[in-house]
A protein has these predicted regions:
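Distinct, well-ordered alpha-helical segments
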Residues: 81-89
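PLP-dependent aminotransferase-class I/II
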Residues: 1-46, 50-55
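Hydrophobic beta-strand scaffold residues
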Residues: 3, 70-71, 211
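Active-site-proximal loop/turn and secondary-structure-junction residues that shape catalytic pockets
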Residues: 43, 76-78, 104, 227-229
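Structural preference for beta-strand elements that scaffold enzyme active sites
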Residues: 36, 67-71, 97, 220-222
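Active-site C-terminal subdomain of aminotransferase-like
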Residues: 33-45, 50, 87, 93-174, ...
Length: 243
């Protein structure tokens, strides 16, 4: 298997790149057909930026014209609708198989769903077993998922409403520098110049707020937006940060 990474340093892959490699692979001394295109969206290593939906449509049409399968690494794909206006079904319809995390969205202790047509999924349990996925008592890992599934997208929208209120409150204090990620989804960037990160994290934790560790070079906190913010109010959170 020959893996070819594309879109270096970017979140959105472009059809032109794919065409180049499909044609190059087919035209070598030993022709090698591209069998699968895998796309991640949102892209974790790019601060959860989302891939351009219109570009995905072009890629999907091209892949199907050329007999190439498409896989979506959509671990956090239930966040996409709020930002792109496109539903989970609209995204999934462009792909032959889709991966969704159960713990990143729905509070499962672990686990994921791999979805696809019957022909693809039938017999997949043999592959799962090969990688140790046949635990006889795995149900506790996903027992709570159904409790959060139906309301997740609504809860996520409310989470961003609360986050925007928090950001507005913090921006009224010039000690805080905040940036939203272009084409972003569930993350914003927070910088607090002149503050010792370890001390800030410790003081926040004393008030029940768990902070991520900042970037080792820039000192930026990569703040994740999720429904845990709804456990309190933006005003209370802002007071914790400011004090």
């Amino acid at each position: 298997m020959n893996l070819i990474p594309l879109a270096q340093g970017r979140s959105s892959i472009e059809l032109a790149e794919i065409k180049h490699w499909v044609e190059r692979s087919a035209g070598g001394r030993v022709p090698s057909k591209v069998g699968v295109i895998s796309v991640e969206s949102p892209v974790r290593r790019k601060n959860d930026e989302m891939v351009n939906f219109e570009e995905l449509q072009l890629i999907s049409a091209y892949a199907r014209e050329n007999g190439i399968r498409l896989h979506l690494d959509g671990a956090r794909m239930f966040n996409l609708h709020f930002h792109s206006g496109k539903s989970v079904k609209q995204y999934a319809a462009l792909f032959d198989s889709v991966y969704v995390s159960l713990w990143k969205h729905f509070n499962g202790a672990s686990g994921a769903i791999l979805a696809g047509d019957t022909k693809f999924i039938e017999g997949m349990f043999h592959t799962r077993r090969m990688f140790g996925g046949s635990l006889p008592h795995a149900w506790p890992q996903v027992a709570v998922v159904s409790q959060y599934l139906d309301s997740y997208e609504s809860d996520y929208e409310k989470s961003w409403q609360a986050t925007d209120e928090l950001i507005a409150l913090l921006q009224s204090d010039n000690r805080f520098k905040i940036e939203k990620v272009p084409n972003g989804t569930s993350r914003f960037l927070l910088l607090i110049p002149g503050v010792t990160a370890d001390g800030f994290i410790e003081r926040a934790l004393e008030h029940g707020v768990m902070m991520p560790h900042p970037h080792a070079v820039t000192g930026v906190f990569q703040m994740q937006v999720n429904p845990t913010i709804l456990r309190t109010t933006p005003e209370k959170l802002a007071r914790v940060f400011m004090n």
